[in-house]
C-alpha cells in the first residue's frame, strides 16, 4: 500500500516544471465512470440503507360461476442493502515545486483524481476488482453465474442480439451497453441482413454512440478487463449507486502522513509541503427483482455479458 507517493522533480514529473520553451500541458479529458453515468443513483442519509425489491408476485384466478369463491394472492419484497464505503487519496506536493511550476498544478491534479475514482468504482462494480466486501456482487460475475453469457464470434451483431434475447427471457429490457475501449470501431461496419447499420456513432464527435438504438459507453478509464468481456448489456436501472458524499477536496498545509505501521513518511510543516485530500463516500448494489418470466433468482439477472473470444475456460 503506497503511503509515500509524492509529486516531485523526478523525470516523470519534470514536464510540470517547464522550460521557457514550452509552458503548456496538453492532456486528454478525464475518462468518466460508466457506473456514475448509467446506474440508478440514490442519495443516502446514512451509512446503511435498504432498498425494497419485488420478490414475490401476486397471482390472479378466474372465479367459477356466479357464486364462486375468489382466491387470495400475495406480494412480497426483499431488501437490497446499500453500505457506504469511503474512497480517498492524499496527494502531497513540495511547496518549492509548486512555486517553480508555471502551470496551476492543482488544476491538473484534480481532474485526474476524479478519473482515478471513476476507475476504482467501475472496476469494483463491473468486475469485482478491489470491491469492498460490504458491496453487492459485481455485474460480470453475477451475469455469468446466471447463465446470461454469449461468447463473441464472427458475427457480433448476432451475438449482441442473442444476448438481448437472454435478458428478455428473464423479463428484463436492455436499455444500454458498456464495452471495452475500441469496440465502437469494430461495430461501425456491421450491418443487418437488410443493410442497416446496427451501431451509430455520435455525429457531434462526443464519446459513445448507439447500438441497436441503445446508448453504448466505452469504458476508457482503465477499469475494463478485456480478457473477460467485450460488452455488458442490461437494464441499468437495476444497478444502484448510493451517494452519501460527492468528491470533496481539502487542502492541508500542516500535518503528517503515516504508513500502515504508523511511521511518519511526510511531515508537511517540517518538509515544506502541502497536500490535497480527496474523499468520496459511495455504495453499490444490484437489484434482481422477480419477473413473470423467471421466478428463480439463481438463473435471473438484469445484465448479460458478451464474453471475449479469447476467454479461457477454467
Labelled PLM ranges:
Residues 1-23, 31-34, 64, 267-314:
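Protruding loop/beta-arch "assembly-hinge" segments enriched in small, turn-prone residues
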Residues 2-89:
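Assembly/oligomerization interface modules of large self-assembling protein complexes
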Residues 45, 141-274, 280, 311-314:
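Extended oligomerization regions of viral-like shell subunits
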Residues 51, 113, 276:
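A residue-level signal for conserved active-site and pocket-lining positions in enzyme catalytic cores
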Residues 57-60, 88, 97, 119, ...:
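Short loop/turn segments at secondary-structure transitions that flank enzyme active sites
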Residues 65-70, 105-109, 193-194, 290-300:
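Short intrinsically disordered coil segments
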Residues 101, 186-189, 286:
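Extracytoplasmic/secreted cell-surface and envelope-processing proteins
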Amino acid at each position: 500500500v503506497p503511503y509515500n507517493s509524492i509529486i516531485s522533480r523526478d523525470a516523470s514529473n519534470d514536464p510540470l516544471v517547464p522550460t521557457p520553451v514550452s509552458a503548456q500541458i496538453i492532456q486528454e479529458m478525464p475518462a468518466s465512470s460508466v457506473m456514475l453515468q448509467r446506474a440508478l443513483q440514490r442519495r443516502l442519509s446514512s451509512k446503511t440503507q435498504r432498498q425494497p425489491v419485488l420478490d414475490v408476485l401476486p397471482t390472479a384466478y378466474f372465479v367459477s360461476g356466479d357464486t364462486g369463491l375468489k382466491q387470495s394472492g400475495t406480494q412480497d419484497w426483499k431488501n437490497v442493502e446499500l453500505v457506504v464505503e469511503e474512497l480517498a487519496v492524499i496527494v502531497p506536493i513540495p511547496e518549492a515545486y509548486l512555486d517553480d511550476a508555471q502551470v496551476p498544478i492543482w488544476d491538473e491534479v484534480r481532474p485526474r483524481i476524479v478519473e482515478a475514482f471513476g476507475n476504482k468504482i467501475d472496476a469494483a462494480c463491473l468486475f469485482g476488482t478491489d470491491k469492498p466486501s460490504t458491496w453487492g456482487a459485481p455485474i460480470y460475475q453475477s451475469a455469468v453465474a446466471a447463465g446470461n453469457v454469449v461468447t463473441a464470434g464472427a458475427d457480433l451483431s448476432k451475438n449482441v442480439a442473442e444476448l438481448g434475447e437472454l435478458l428478455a427471457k428473464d423479463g428484463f429490457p436492455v436499455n444500454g451497453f458498456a464495452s471495452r475501449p475500441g469496440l465502437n470501431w469494430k461495430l461501425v461496419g456491421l450491418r443487418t441482413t437488410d443493410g442497416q447499420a446496427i451501431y451509430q456513432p455520435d455525429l457531434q464527435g462526443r464519446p459513445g454512440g448507439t447500438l441497436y438504438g441503445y446508448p453504448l459507453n466505452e469504458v476508457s478509464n482503465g477499469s475494463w478487463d478485456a480478457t473477460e468481456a467485450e460488452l455488458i448489456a442490461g437494464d441499468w436501472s437495476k444497478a444502484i449507486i448510493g451517494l452519501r458524499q460527492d468528491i470533496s477536496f481539502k487542502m492541508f498545509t500542516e500535518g503528517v502522513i503515516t504508513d500502515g505501521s504508523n511511521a511518519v513518511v511526510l511531515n508537511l510543516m517540517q518538509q515544506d509541503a502541502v497536500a490535497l485530500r480527496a474523499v468520496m463516500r459511495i455504495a453499490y448494489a444490484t437489484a434482481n427483482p422477480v419477473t413473470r418470466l423467471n421466478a428463480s433468482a439463481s438463473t435471473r439477472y438484469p445484465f448479460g455479458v458478451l464474453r471475449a473470444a479469447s476467454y479461457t475456460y477454467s
